[in-house]
Structure formats: structure tokens, C-alpha cells
Amino acid sequence: MSLNDFLSSVLPVSEQFEYLSLQSIPLETHAVVTPNKDDKRVPKSTIKTQHFFSLFHQGKVFFSLEVYVYVTLWDEADAERLIFVSKADTNGYCNTRVSVRDITKIILEFILSIDPNYYLQKVKPAIRSYKKISPELISAASTPARTLRILARRLKQSGSTVLKEIESPRFQQDLYLSFTCPREILTKICLFTRPASQYLFPDSSKNSKKHILNGEELMKWWGFILDRLLIECFQNDTQAKLRIPGEDPARVRSYLRGMKYPLWQVGDIFTSKENSLAVYNIPLFPDDPKARFIHQLAEEDRLLKVSLSSFWIELQERQEFKLSVTSSVMGISGYSLATPSLFPSSADVIVPKSRKQFRAIKKYITGEEYDTEEGAIEAFTNIRDFLLLRMATNLQSLTGKREHRERNQPVPASNINTLAITMLKPRKKAKALPKT
């Protein structure tokens, strides 16, 4: 299935939408979790890829989602994939009824369907060895004189200073790394929930039509999405964890009673033992409060002194947790039911040529002001024009296919859940007829 197929299945029938699906060039990066020097199992490489999705309706952006995918290679036969959900946001400027929860879930399903090898074909190395690249290429190590000689040679040979063969395999192997891994690998999804008036659409909270969730509502909203993914996309022995820093475990378990998946537990998917050091267990994600606290511990020279149990206690005392709102850490860890096999096409993702260009395109969404509808319109217009004029491509269009069912419309008999029937409240006793 293409991204178009995934999205159209949850968008209202006959309604027209456009979508932006940005993907960064996969980058070799540091390990997600700092390895202990005593660990016998140390990652060989970690590849990070950023996804940014936006949906448009009637010439206005109304939804965006930011996700990072990490593929950790332990060796040629062992790897794992970690999907970090960074931010999701709406601005209230959609003129038709849509389920943002279902849109978010279906995009995560799309990411889960991607073969992890897709991210490993063309990886920008953390450090490039310029001494080993072809002398025909201009690099950061090229002197001005050498650069001029290369440009003059290109101009003489092809009439242009642009190297048209830059995408050929002989040059790509000089510039990028490539790896392989099994398709069936351990998959983790994790996220941090903390309520805010806006995440990706500045000033959108000033729009009275925007629906803003409080901490408990937001946690339940994401919990529903992960719970559905567990049931529909993961094997039945998958781990599922919820941690609310500073909250009593009994209270956390009360939230888990509403989950359909039976193996939810209190805790997080990264903790092995509570008395082990936090630095060797806490993941380092972009713009994440847990990672910020780890960096603070490094500045205070306390990395080798704070255990996991102390980490969670101290974390709740930080300013971003002291607002009397519910914040949580959620995660699942297991194997997919279906083997990921999708290699996204150019219709599924747009891959800018550099991180700078990726950020510039994303900025057209996140840099607008959404206190009025004009911001949503400007974002759509700027994205559309940039893609057309600078990248010779377009936003992808789709037509929704989901039929809307009124609340009082009966569910077809074939789809009725018999378990739900047995759980209906008992019928009240009929009042006795008056005696005559």
C-alpha cells in the first residue's frame, strides 16, 4: 500500500486533500542509548531518519506530525528499529470533520510497513573521509585551486560545471554508506506526552476552533493509538509500558484498565533494573525532556551517580513537570505481525537534498503564525510554490474513502462484537401494573 492508500482509508469519502511527506537523508548518528563500556553488546551503527507529515484541505494546512526512525545495527544478523513520535499538532482550520487520532495512527502504520533496509541504502556517514573520495568531486577538503581546476575540466568536457553523474553508483559509494539487516527485527515505538497549547503551529491556540487536550486526555488519546497498534500490528507477546513520573503505580495501573491489549504494565521499555545508572538506559531523543535532563546531569558531573529510580524522582521536580499536569512516557517493544516490505516511492516521500533544505521546507509550516486562518493559507501556498519552483514536484492529492456513519445509525449485524453485548447494563425491572 502507498501512503495515499493509507491516508484515504481514514479521510471522509469524496473529500479532496493534499499531503506533504518529507523525509531526511538517513544519517549515521550516536547510539540512541549511551552504551556502557562493560556491555558485551555494543551497536555497530545507528541510522537516524526524520519524517515530517502535513495534511491540507481546501488550501489550508491543518495537521502535522513529526517522527524519527532509528535503525540500530548490532551486527549483520541483528538489528532493531525504534520509532520516536516527537510531535503531533492541529490548528483547527479544517472545514470538514476528520479523525486526527485515526490519521495519526494510520501514518504510524505506514511507517511500520516500511522495510528497515529502505533507510540503509544511502546513509550519510557521521564523518566523511575526504581522502578516499574521487578526485572528480569537490569536497570540504578541496583547495580553491583544485576546485577551480575541477570546474574548468567539467566545463570543457560537458559544457557545464554541474556534475551530471553525481547520482551514479561510482560516486554514491564515495559519499554514502550502505548496510543491510533482516526485515523482521525488534520494533519499538516510544513517545512522551505533555500537554501544550501548540506544538507545531505557533499561535494556533488563539483559534477558538482548535481542540486542546489536558494532560490526562492527551495521555489517553495516545494510549488509544498505541493500544490499537498493539492489537492490529504487533505479535501478542509485545511489551507495552506506561510511566507517569511522580505518580503512584496503583494510580498508573488504573489508567491501564481501559486498554484492550492485556500486557500493559507500569514502567518504560528502556529500564532494565531500577538501581542501574540512568545514563546507560535513557534514550537521547531530539527536543525531549529526558534527554535534556541527562545533559544537565553531564554538566553537573553526576552522570555516574544517578540511578534510574533517582532519575525519575528528580525528573518530576523539573520545571516542565511542575505544572500540575499529567505527563507520561509510553512505549511498546515487539515484533510486527506482518513483515515490513514497503520501499516508499517518490509519491510517498519527498527527500530534500540536504538537512538545510529539509528544515527550510518544514519551516514553511512551523514558522507561520496561526492566530488567524491566513497562516494556514500562507503555509499551503508557500509549500506548494517551493516544491513546484525549486524541486519540480507537487503536493500529493488524494480523495477520502471513509464513509461517515451517524452515531444513531445501527451497526451491521456482521460487525457486532458479541463480547460488547454481554457487557451491556442489566435491564431495569419493569414497573408492576397498578392493581385494578
From Swiss-Prot:
Effect of residue 89 to A: Abolishes histone acetylase activity
Domain Rtt109-type HAT as annotated: residue spans: 2-404
SMART domains tied to this protein: KAT11
Modification sites for N6-acetyllysine: 290
Effect of residue 221 to A: Decreases histone acetylase activity
Molecular functions (GO terms): histone H3 acetyltransferase activity; histone H3K14 acetyltransferase activity; histone H3K23 acetyltransferase activity; histone H3K27 acetyltransferase activity; histone H3K56 acetyltransferase activity; histone H3K9 acetyltransferase activity; protein-lysine-acetyltransferase activity
Effect ascribed to mutating residue 148 to D: Decreases binding and activity stimulation by VPS75. Decreases acetylation of histone H3 'Lys-9' and 'Lys-27'
Record-listed E.C. numbers: 2.3.1.48
Catalyzed chemical reaction(s): L-lysyl-[histone] + acetyl-CoA = N(6)-acetyl-L-lysyl-[histone] + CoA + H(+); L-lysyl-[protein] + acetyl-CoA = N(6)-acetyl-L-lysyl-[protein] + CoA + H(+)
Principal cellular location given in the protein's record: nucleus
Region ranges (Interaction with VPS75): 128-170
Superkingdom of source: Eukaryota
Location of the region described as Interaction with ASF1 in the Swiss-Prot/TrEMBL record: 419-433
pH dependence: Optimum pH is >8.5.
Keywords, comma-separated and alphabetical: Acetylation, DNA damage, Nucleus, Transcription, Transcription regulation, Transferase
Effect upon mutating residue 211 to A: Decreases histone acetylase activity
Phenotype of the disrupted gene, per the record: Abolishes acetylation of histone H3 'Lys-56'; simultaneous disruption of GCN5 also abolishes acetylation of histone H3 'Lys-9' and 'Lys-27'. Decreases acetylation of histone H3 'Lys-9' and 'Lys-23'. Decreases HTA1 RNA level; simultaneous disruption of HIR1 or RTT106 alleviates the effect. Increases sensitivity to methyl methane sulfonate, hydroxyurea, and camptothecin (genotoxic stress).
GO biological process, one term: DNA damage response
InterPro entries the UniProt entry points to: HAT_RTT109-like, Histone_AcTrfase_Rtt109/CBP, Rtt109
Induction of expression: Expression peaks in cell cycle G1.
Subunit structure: Forms a complex composed of two RTT109 subunits and one VPS75 homodimer; each RTT109 subunit interacts predominantly with VPS75 instead of interacting with the other RTT109 subunit. Interacts with VPS75; the interaction is direct. Interacts (via C-terminus) with ASF1; the interaction is direct. Interacts with histone H3/H4 heterodimers via histone H3.
Remaining remarks: Present with 1140 molecules/cell in log phase SD medium.
Reported function: Histone chaperone-dependent acetylase that modifies 'Lys-9', 'Lys-14', 'Lys-23', 'Lys-27', and 'Lys-56' on histone H3 (H3K9Ac, H3K14Ac and H3K23Ac, H3K27Ac, and H3K56Ac) to promote nucleosome assembly, genomic stability, DNA repair and transcriptional regulation during mitotic S-phase. Its residue selectivity is influenced by the acetylation status of histone H3, and also the presence of histone chaperone ASF1 that shifts selectivity to 'Lys-56' when H3K14Ac is already present.
Record's protein name: Histone acetyltransferase RTT109
Native source organism of the sequence: Saccharomyces cerevisiae (strain ATCC 204508 / S288c)
